[in-house]
């Protein structure tokens, strides 16, 4: 299953997301927000997305194969296409920890 990351899970579109190497740490936050909105926009148009962090594991190979300039840093990939509702992997759900297990909220119990 993990190898399918490198084939973009057979999606019709595979995106390689890069950042200019000279950008500061804040650019990662900006990119994360942009990718979030990209995923929301795709969903609004009936498309599904899947972020692929594994692509960065072989950034040198990807960079060479796609002739991406060296001043760009490969951050991740993104598969874009139509969700396959029948695929077993799309039915799998992990257990989720309750929010209280990893987050603390203070001051939200007062009325607005």
Which role fits each region the language model picked out?
Residues 1-112:
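Acidic, surface-exposed loops and disordered segments
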